[in-house]
Amino acid sequence: MIRRLDGGYELDDDPARIDVEAVFRFLHDESYWAKNRPRDRVEEQLAAAGRLVGLYGPDGALCGFSRTVANVQGLAYLADLFVLAPHRGRGLGVELVRETVERGPYAHLRWLVKTEDAQELYARFGFEPPEERLLERAPRPDLHASRQP
């Protein structure tokens, strides 16, 4: 799928086109949710993703990205989504969320996202605070599979 946007931008879900270095740099250096995430972990997550969507500028370079983790039985999680600073303020984040959540193979599923700063953006796509029964378990690095005997 390639979807063309105004201003020469386009969205593409071809995983071979994703600039892994650009994704790693943003997640590791700039994001609040994945700060200092190791490169091998980023690569593992990209390989295991249900869907990757790249946002590309007029020059063809990656300028935004989303990663979906999905269980086709009924749940999709919007794990990483960003638009690089020079490209913000043009509605590109809205289009990236729309492509990720409302189009593609997981559009019909229940979606979850965890965000500290984009509640209004996600509310435009029907995201609401979860029901009170939703529970979360914090990450347990001590139980990471690579550390088990």
Describe every region a protein language model picked out.
Residues 1-37, 146-149:
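Short amphipathic alpha-helix that is part of the acyltransferase structural core
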Residues 10-17, 32, 52, 63, ...:
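Hydrophobic/basic alpha-helical segments enriched in Actinobacteria
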Residues 29, 48-49, 107:
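Structured helix-beta-strand junction loops
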Residues 42-59, 63-82:
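A conserved beta-strand-loop-helix scaffold within acyl/acetyltransferase catalytic domains
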Residues 87-96:
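Conserved acetyl-CoA pyrophosphate-binding loop and the N-cap/start of the following alpha-helix
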Residues 106-140:
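Conserved active-site alpha-helix within GNAT-family acetyltransferase domains
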